[in-house]
Amino acid sequence: MTAPQEPEDAAGSIFSTSGDRAVADAAERAKVTASRNIPVFDDLPLPADTANLRKGVDFNDALLALLPLVGVWRGEGEGRGPHGDYRFGQQIVVSHDGGDYLNWEARSWRLTESGEYDRVGLRETGFWRFVSDPADPSESQAIELLLAHSAGYIELFYGHPRNQSSWELVTDALARSKSGMLVGGAKRLYGIVEGGDLAYVEERVDADGGLVPHLSARLARYVG
């Protein structure tokens, strides 16, 4: 696995194409993705979660800087673990219910060398929102990402939008259960890249205390 690059470098910036091209690409994708949404129970009295901004309850204005993330994303990536590098498939669902937070669910599965399903991989669920910057409350709002990992730990990130289509976050706190995996903090960078895909890289602190490549992926929009 090569050293992580920023999504703009790894997959090409969406801004490298003309505005007309970007609009045309989005319109073409929407022919397939615009009619899709996540399954929900329709007999609950509260607003249903939606991963399609064309459907469901109105989007909360407090989250406009995170709006491009909403959708269902699917694709493949590369990881580095204690036993070497590996490939994985992944689905990320980013939905909302009109509240001042985004719902986040990421599921991954290991792939064989030929690209076939091998076994269950990492899974995490959590919430994105904006809060007062813990480092400087007088400054602009910070992104807060709270995640629970199936590997047995809870992680709190803070960060900021880098521009209208990329977001950077760093671990602020981490709590591990007795059965949980021993991990260090992380740095994540997400970005919407050329073609409208969602790309990200994650580095994690290793035993020597330095950030090392851990995960990277490029995911195509499936819903929204």
From Swiss-Prot:
List, separated by semicolons, the cofactors it needs: heme b
Query: Can the keyword Iron be found in this entry's annotation?
Result: yes
UniProt cross-references to InterPro entries, sorted A to Z: Calycin, Nb(III)_bact/plant, Nitrobindin, THAP4-like_heme-bd
Q: Which reaction does it catalyse?
A: peroxynitrite = nitrate
Record pathway: Nitrogen metabolism
Q: Does the keyword tRNA processing apply?
A: no
Residue numbers of motif GXWXGXG?
71-77
- Which Gene3D superfamilies does the entry mention? 2.40.128.20
| Pfam families in UniProt | THAP4_heme-bd
Q: What is its EC number?
A: 5.99.-.-
Listed binding positions for heme b are K187, H214
| Keywords attached to this entry | Heme, Iron, Isomerase, Metal-binding
GO molecular function annotations of the record:
heme binding; metal ion binding; peroxynitrite isomerase activity
Q: How does it assemble?
A: Homodimer.
Q: Which PANTHER family does the entry link to?
A: PEROXYNITRITE ISOMERASE THAP4, THAP4 PROTEIN
Protein name per UniProt = Peroxynitrite isomerase
